[in-house]
Amino acid sequence: MGVGIQVRDLNAYYGKAHVLKHVDMKMAPNHVTALIGPSGCGKSTFVRCLNRMHETIPEAYAEGEVLVGDKDIYARGTAAVDVRRRVGMVFQKPNPFPTMSIYDNVASGLKLNGIRKKAVLDEAVQRSLEASALWNEVKDHLHKKSGASLSGGQQQRLCIARALAVQPDVLLMDEPASALDPISTSKIEELMFTLKENYTVVVVTHNMQQAARVAEYTGFFLMGSVIEFDTTQKIFTTPSDKRTEDYITGRFG
């Protein structure tokens, strides 16, 4: 089952540039939370801080608390690799390993964690592909086709399966449908509804209609700060801050 995420006074930097400023947010378990805002507002940096991907960039670092369940992922002695096992990530552009089969793409994280038993891998691959609504489309050529041979929408669902294979608590999705056609986008959105039954889902999106369709909660970012965080219905119908209203109604962004 998914776990809640509580962010307290999170600040992120690229060298001397202060790009996330005193962010507080509480994301409910087994719900979809959408993050919206104009380009460069900090929402993608924020989501990367939730599994410590931000620190993989030279001179980038973060300060503050991020509790996944009851564990602060920035606590001294916490290994980033353990954090990323609990908090999976799916990126804007599908990135399957091009030389690997569909099967090996999904099993790659498990193998990195030392799992070698075929029966265990087989079960995990099928479970993950079923959870990402891809199993029926690829089950007959798991070992014959590479991940790169799939369509764009299938590749993105393969990347979701790869993230799910290690059984995370949280799934982060950074504009997962922005590079896809409308039909593939619809499948990704449908998938979010089923994924939240077992995972906490956080999605970055530029698509306001998508946020309204898929998320129970929405946070609006602007210039590195969270301007407003509330239920999606309230954000889109009666926002408390005029800047939120201006963004949602297209006055800027």
Swiss-Prot record:
GO CC terms of this entry: plasma membrane
Record-linked InterPro entries: AAA+_ATPase, ABC_transporter-like_ATP-bd, ABC_transporter-like_CS, P-loop_NTPase, PstB-like
GO molecular function terms listed in the Swiss-Prot or TrEMBL record: ATP binding; ATP hydrolysis activity; ATPase-coupled phosphate ion transmembrane transporter activity
Statement: the UniProt record of this protein carries the keyword Metal-binding: no
Membrane topology: Peripheral membrane protein
Protein family per UniProt: Belongs to the ABC transporter superfamily. Phosphate importer (TC 3.A.1.7) family.
Name this protein carries in UniProt: Phosphate import ATP-binding protein PstB
Taxonomic source organism: Koribacter versatilis (strain Ellin345)
